[in-house]
Amino acid sequence: MDTSKNLVSHWDAAYHKDDEQLGWFESNPESTLQLINTCNLKKDASILNVGSGTTLLIDTLLGQGYTNIIANDLSEVALTKLKMRIQKKYAFELNCVPDDLTNSSKVGNLKNIDLWVDRAVLHFFLKEEEQKAYFKLIDNVMATNGFVLIAVFSLDGAEKCCGLDLQRYNLEMLQQGLGKAFKLIETFNFTYINPFGDKRPYIYTLFQKQ
């Protein structure tokens, strides 16, 4: 499963399930919100949630008054479900951008992003060229002083998710990927308990572009 087309089909199939049946479902994205609150963003700040799936994070951000939110995912099935839910619950037209972060044709056109949020996306990119493309994309779209929030499986985390192999990370690996232009603001480890009761150790990081 190493072609973009196959991966789209894989994720589309996953998101045909109910959200609560997904191994990464969070009813309360508290760890992500903890880092977002550290940023002290303006309510019209440009927030890009990559690999959003059908996340409830966007509901929470809307509830906090943020108005400029962009959702990205490889799966249009996920984005359609997310967009329809947000429209129905909040009468808000969510900007959804289907795109492959390792070979971007749309996200790369965005500029001056104030906050990049990635929970559990980067660790699916196994090839060095995919990882380099991901980090280059971040550098290209981020505003100066913009924040990058990355939460991925830590080195002692699971080796697979949703049937796919993972590249697990520590802080040094993430810093190396982002480069010296990004300063670490905060990091912590967090063990997420998924809907099936399994432990999933994560490393959460927040960087700022200098």
Regions found by a protein language model. Name each.
Residues 1-111, 125-141, 146-210:
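Class I (Rossmann-like) S-adenosyl-L-methionine-dependent methyltransferase catalytic domain
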Residues 114:
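Conserved acidic residues
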Residues 117:
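A conserved beta-strand element that flanks and buttresses the S-adenosyl-L-methionine
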Residues 120-124:
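Short catalytic micro-motifs in class I SAM-dependent methyltransferases
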